[in-house]
From Swiss-Prot:
InterPro entries: TMEM214. Keywords: Apoptosis, Endoplasmic reticulum, Glycoprotein, Membrane, Transmembrane, Transmembrane helix. This is Transmembrane protein 214-B. It comes from Xenopus laevis (African clawed frog). Belongs to the TMEM214 family.
């Protein structure tokens, strides 16, 4: 504002207070804004450099003069003549801009160089207050990225809108966040509460800039929000009557889970699972869990995050009817239940399943839904099959859960043949214990239908144990042992194999003569091959040395020269790489997409898994097999490996192979002749 001086002279009047007073007020406001609020009180927002329009303020200072008296008297007349035109307020230093149709158009129109200049000004003016830098970044991006319609986040990918920005803008954002690592939580809170304030307005602005800043922080530092989840849960509960605000908080905090599976499970269990069942929030809570499990196919990183206290409420939500979930939501949660069960049981289910057995057993009542009863019985069977301690837990709970135990016993009767041998042994001991308990109850006269059902199931199990299938394998083993023992006794009785009855049978059948003929042929061929090698190998070796010796010497000399040259060049390259490798790494981090790093991480985990699971056991087994074979070979040669021993071993192997081949051929020939004779 301006007015004429009493003496009729022009007088320069500046807007507001003095610059020193204004800056002092700004620093005071900024200091107040940096204080982290306790509880759920909203963060007091300070004016950022961009919002104050410091650049325009400095340009306008010293240029405003007091107009003449007649000019000041004409202003009300002009305002009356043009009532539609409003006088711009002195505090509005930022001009309104037109909105873009899509976020892609807004990002293309964004002037990255201007953003860089504004951020540099902010850092120069407030070098010791990085919270102003990050707030300026959020305010600038949100002001510039205005669209006609706000996209529905539930219909977009989990990394939207951060996935749309280019590498240059990502580099600027990341470099600024790297300079302010201690105020990242302040930035996230600033963006969240700014979005909540915009939602209070009838025609609020788009929130793309705030969302991009939240994603940029939590993609690298997910623990920024997971370290204080109770605060966000209280904030969520305070806005339950405003679904859009709740979804905004859930979306913002949920961004921490897409780079770290453990932090994502913390977010879902600590923020979204408590509101599961709230009508307007349940769809996003289930969708977030689906996207989280889809983004992290390797569930091993989440082992230990879900315990019995969290798992069984999830089980009830997934299978119990008439709860606060709709049938479609319950079906979606039921599809995710198997992965949640794997996470709950952990890497060693054989040592943790007995802790889940009591809760499984108490829920497996005859009146529970069929699908839930099927899942509970299957889980109880897994507990008994994998964790032997579950049997002792079952024996302790038997008298308190007779109806549930009868269902489990009947299931064991139906699936008895498919149970493992170790489980059958434990079931036998448990059933005998149950029989004793049933007898005690019957003696006291406290019989019931559930007790009778349990007793009948125990009787059926005992009957199953006694009436097993025909032991074919035992019969085959016994027959083989009997045949081998008979031959051995026959040879021992007649003092030699040639005089034994077994040899006579083989002689009459023609097998003995055939095997002798085969052995003679193999021995003859082996002797011929040995004599050929003894005659020709020295001659061929001398010729090879005469022809290839000079060539091999030249190759060896060239190899030495090439090795020396490679070492010389390699040292130069190593020194060059040592000097330039940090720059290359920094350039790669700013240029390569994040998906490439994720793919490399997945590939590394796959190779590590293959190395530990398959390669190392295979190498160990191969080493043991080779060592065992060599020991057996040395033992067969009486501890000394000679050429005669090698020749004998080769002869034995050849004889055995030829005998087996001839026997197989004769068997096949006889079978073919039999088939032909039938026709």
């Amino acid at each position: 504002m301006a007015s004429g001086a009493p003496d009729g002279k022009w007088k320069v009047v500046k807007k507001g207070k003095k610059s020193g007073e204004r800056r002092e007020g700004e620093r005071k406001a900024l200091t107040e804004s940096n204080v982290t609020p306790g509880g759920t009180a909203p963060i007091k927002m300070a004016n950022t450099v961009y919002e104050m329009g410091f650049d325009r303020i400095h340009k306008k200072q010293n240029k405003e003069q007091v107009p003449p008296n007649n000019m000041s008297s004409e202003q009300p007349q002009k305002q009356q003549q043009n009532p539609g035109k409003k006088k711009p307020q002195s505090g509005d230093s930022v001009c309104k801009q037109s909105k873009f149709h899509t976020l892609e158009c807004a990002l293309k129109a964004l002037d990255v160089a201007e953003l860089q200049r504004d951020l540099e000004k902010s850092q120069n003016m407030f070098p010791e207050n990085p919270s102003i830098w990050v707030k300026d970044l959020a305010g600038y991006l949100n002001y510039k990225l205005q669209t006609v319609k706000n996209d529905v986040l539930i219909q977009q990918s989990h990394d939207y809108p951060y996935c749309l920005i280019n590498k240059e803008l990502k580099g600027i954002v990341r470099s600024l966040l790297a300079k302010a690592p201690h105020v990242l939580d302040v930035m996230v809170d600033h963006c969240i509460f700014s979005m909540l304030q915009e939602l209070d307005k009838p025609t609020g602005e788009s929130l793309h800039g705030y969302r991009i800043c939240i994603q940029a922080v939590l993609l690298d530092k997910p623990k920024t929000v997971t370290s204080n989840l109770p605060k966000y849960l209280e904030l969520l509960r305070s806005h339950l009557n405003r679904p859009m605000k709740c979804l905004t908080v859930m979306w913002a905090v949920g961004q921490a889970g897409f780079t770290d599976f453990t932090e994502g499970l913390k977010v879902w269990l600590g923020l979204m699972f408590p509101v599961l069942g709230v009508k307007n929030l349940t769809p996003y809570a289930i969708l977030y869990l689906d996207r989280l499990l889809l983004a992290h196919s390797n569930l091993t990183k989440g082992f230990g995050m879900i315990g019995p206290k969290d798992f069984f409420p999830i089980l009830d939500f997934a299978f119990m009817p008439n709860n606060s979930l709709t049938p479609s939501q319950q079906e979606n949660l039921r599809n995710l239940y198997p992965k949640l069960k794997v996470l709950a049981l952990g890497a060693t289910p054989e040592s943790t399943l007995h802790t889940y057995f009591p809760s499984f057993l108490s829920r497996a009542t005859p009146s529970c839904p069929a699908e839930m009863r099927k899942e509970l019985i299957h889980s109880l069977t897994d507990c008994l099959n994998k964790d032997s301690l579950s049997f002792s837990v079952w024996r302790q709970l038997y008298t308190k859960h007779l109806s549930q135990s009868s269902l489990l016993l009947q299931h064991l009767v139906e699936t008895w043949d498919s149970n493992s041998r170790a489980m059958r042994k434990s079931v036998r001991e448990t059933v005998h214990s149950f029989k004793v308990t049933n007898g005690e109850f019957s003696g006291k006269g406290s019989s019931s239908k559930d007790l009778e059902a349990c007793d009948a199931a125990c009787q059926a199990l005992l009957h199953k144990m006694k009436s097993g299938g025909f032991p074919w394998w035992r019969l085959i083993v016994i027959a083989f042992v009997f045949l081998f023992g008979s031959v051995l006794y026959d040879v021992r009785t007649h003092n030699s194999f040639q005089e034994s009855t077994s040899a006579q049978i083989l002689q009459q059948s023609g097998l003995l003569s055939v095997s002798r003929e085969a052995w003679n042929k193999v021995s003859n061929y082996s002797l011929q091959g040995q004599s050929w090698l003894e005659r020709n190998v020295p001659q061929y070796y001398s010729q090879a040395v005469e022809v290839l010796g000079p060539v091999l010497e030249q190759v060896w000399a060239k190899t030495q020269e090439g090795g020396a040259y490679a070492c010389e060049k390699g040292s130069v390259l190593l020194s060059y790489a040592k000097d330039n490798l940090p720059r290359l790494i920094e350039w790669l981090h700013s240029s390569i997409p994040d998906s490439v790093f994720q793919f490399i991480e997945y590939l590394r985990e796959l190779l590590l898994h293959l190395h530990q699971t398959y390669l190392l056991p295979a190498v160990t087994y191969l080493e043991a097999a080779v060592q065992n074979s060599w020991q057996q070979y040395v033992k067969s040669c009486n501890g000394k490996v000679t050429w005669d021993c090698v020749r004998g071993q080769v002869g034995n192997i050849s004889h055995s192979s030829w005998t087996y081949l001839q026997n197989t051929t004769m068997t096949f020939t006889n079978w073919a002749l039999t088939i032909i004779s039938r026709h």
